[in-house]
Amino acid sequence: MSISLLGRIVSQQFSGIRAAGPGRSLYLPFTLLLKQPGAYKVTLHRYVHSTQTKSHLSFLMNNNDITPFQKFTVKVLKEQCKSRGLKLSGRKSDLLQRLITHDSCSNKKSSVKINEPKKKRILINDPIKITKKLVSDKTFRTIEKNISSLQNTPVIETPCDVHSHLQPRDRIFLLGFFMLSCLWWNLEPQESKPTIDH
């Protein structure tokens, strides 16, 4: 019998005591039961359908027992699959298998520790002691590294870099082009002048 049902039965049998307040009235149905001598022997029974399965299920999951899973209904198994983000369709055996594999994988993942590299803190306020010898060695080392890296890089030469001076054939071509342009320029004004016949 649930508590709400018990409250209804008691309120029907007893009218209750009226608790008076300023402009308010409240009936307390259980106060008469407390004043009766046999009222302390009231027992309540909770049936299986009214218990919460989530607390039991989490206890069973922690113990990794497979057999108690089979006692749950398909509806409860689907709720558990939904809470874990698993597929909801299938038979009861499929749901059981998904829950068992998911829990075994999650237990393995929680047991494996991920070692993250510790971040080094750089304190800006602390002065750094550098000797002149260290600075001079460092500059020579960096210069040597730069020179060696420049020597190792491939040199890409453009045609202008390869042939920076004019070849004799280029000189002949440019001289000929210049002379033809001058001749053509001199011939053009003579053709455009009107001829006067006397």
UniProtKB/Swiss-Prot annotation:
<keyword id="KW-1133">Transmembrane helix</keyword>
<feature type="transmembrane region" description="Helical">
    <location>
        <begin position="172"/>
        <end position="187"/>
    </location>
</feature>
<keyword id="KW-0472">Membrane</keyword>
<keyword id="KW-0496">Mitochondrion</keyword>
<keyword id="KW-0809">Transit peptide</keyword>
<keyword id="KW-0812">Transmembrane</keyword>
<dbReference type="InterPro" id="IPR036361">
    <property type="entry name" value="SAP_dom_sf"/>
</dbReference>
<dbReference type="GO" id="GO:0031966">
    <property type="term" value="C:mitochondrial membrane"/>
</dbReference>
<dbReference type="Pfam" id="PF02037">
    <property type="entry name" value="SAP"/>
</dbReference>
<comment type="similarity">
    <text>Belongs to the AIM34 family.</text>
</comment>
<dbReference type="InterPro" id="IPR003034">
    <property type="entry name" value="SAP_dom"/>
</dbReference>
<feature type="domain" description="SAP">
    <location>
        <begin position="69"/>
        <end position="103"/>
    </location>
</feature>
<protein>
    <recommendedName>
        <fullName>Altered inheritance of mitochondria protein 34, mitochondrial</fullName>
    </recommendedName>
</protein>
<feature type="transit peptide" description="Mitochondrion">
    <location>
        <begin position="1"/>
        <end position="55"/>
    </location>
</feature>
